[in-house]
Amino acid sequence: MADAPAPAGGRGGFRGGFGGRGRGRGRGRGRGRGRGRGAKDGDKEWVPVTKLGRLVKDMKIKTLEEIYLFSLPIKEFEIIDFFLGDALKDEVLKIMPVQKQTRAGQRTRFKAFVAIGDYNGHVGLGVKCSKEVATAIRGAIILAKLSVVPVRRGYWGNKIGKPHTVPCKVTGKCGSVLVRLIPAPRGTGIVSAPVPKKLLAMAGIDDCYTSARGQTATLGNFAKATYAAIAATYSYLTPDLWRETVFTKSPYQEYTDYLAKHHGRGAVTAHPTEEKPF
């Protein structure tokens, strides 16, 4: 009888729940099962659910830049994995607990900030809140992939070698934090606080001066302002890009027939309503 309440406590408890039935084994099993599930998802073939995903998988769109050229929204993180793959590196910037006051007391969740980039012109930032740290990090990585933007790089002086810095001064703002990126000569390195330094390095910028003002201790806003500044490198045209624009068809327009023929749900049964008498 002494052991009778244990299952109820184990099932309903928060701290000791589930771990009550074999504490060490339960914890290890949970971790292992999580990893195994992730591995299965990795091995599973990607089945795209958006038109853009279908065009990417069928190799109709061959580069990420084609997507950015037409400002097509990316709704599947597998598209980023398809193009950038192993080149992508992610880093957890911060995990912070956040609380909400409820009738029952305080509900604590964990907020994760994750930066992602290929160190060669692509960078993203993801923020996710969840009950568990691992879930928050996983969600933040997915959101970071969906927010990947191209980075335009330029020169400080003469155009010798590969572009190494930002093309000109750019500014990003989030909350009270304002971040300014200033071109720097080759060999300077990234002169900045640790948070922008990680994002700029992941974006593939080798040399850069930075200036920040506002409440930079708020890491989330500091990271978002830096991300906005990096994204702003493609928001203007410099005189060397004042060429006449040649308009081309969007991939959706170009491959309309292909999408309708191969992937349309109503492609097999054409006009089923015509056969039914009313």
Swiss-Prot record:
Keywords: Ribonucleoprotein, Ribosomal protein
Name of the protein: Small ribosomal subunit protein uS5
Compositional bias segments (type: Basic residues): 22-37
One protein family per Pfam: Ribosomal_S5
Protein source organism: Urechis caupo
UniProt GO molecular function: RNA binding; structural constituent of ribosome
Chain's role: Component of the ribosome, a large ribonucleoprotein complex responsible for the synthesis of proteins in the cell. The small ribosomal subunit (SSU) binds messenger RNAs (mRNAs) and translates the encoded message by selecting cognate aminoacyl-transfer RNA (tRNA) molecules. The large subunit (LSU) contains the ribosomal catalytic site termed the peptidyl transferase center (PTC), which catalyzes the formation of peptide bonds, thereby polymerizing the amino acids delivered by tRNAs into a polypeptide chain.
Stretches the record annotates as Disordered: 1-43
Gene3D superfamilies noted in UniProt: 3.30.160.20, 3.30.230.10
Stretches assigned to the S5 DRBM domain: 88-151
One Gene Ontology CC term in the entry: cytosolic small ribosomal subunit
Gene Ontology BP annotations: translation
Family: Belongs to the universal ribosomal protein uS5 family.
Comp. bias (Gly residues): 9-21
InterPro entries on file: Ribosomal_Su5_D2-typ_SF, Ribosomal_uS5, Ribosomal_uS5_C, Ribosomal_uS5_euk/arc, Ribosomal_uS5_N, Ribosomal_uS5_N_CS, Ribsml_uS5_D2-typ_fold_subgr
